[in-house]
Amino acid sequence: MALVLNDRVRETTTIVGTGTATLLGAATGYQAFSTIGNGNTTYYCISDQGGANWEVGIGTYTSAGTTLARTTVLASSNGGALVSFTAGTKDAFVTYPSEKGVWLDSSGNAIGLGTPAAFIATNVTGLPLTTGVTGTLPVANGGTNITSYAVGDI
């Protein structure tokens, strides 16, 4: 199904171990995971209420039994692996992992991720526009087979 994100989604769970979390209902002032939709995936965080054990990942919500399957762990207090939670109440909420974010500057422009130092282009389509190029481009290669043109030549 679809990856769905919603704001202010938070429930509690008493999950023990590394399995699927049974969700116990929305915290006061928050929405339930049901807003994600049955069978859809979402980014989640599960954290014990002391904050020592936590996990961020991609989970699948199921309305039958109101569960969240911990499908893919993106980061955790267990070195990026599933956390084996111990007894007690945990918070489960929708989050947006920093590694999935698009970084914007203060003007709202995407921050460049750098330019490759060198690369080999293969199977490139289109005609790059370059200044200072002379000669003709044959018609078979998308050109007009002329070195200059006047109004009406094209």
Name what the model sees in each region.
Residues 2-7, 14-154:
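Extracellular repetitive beta-rich solenoid segments
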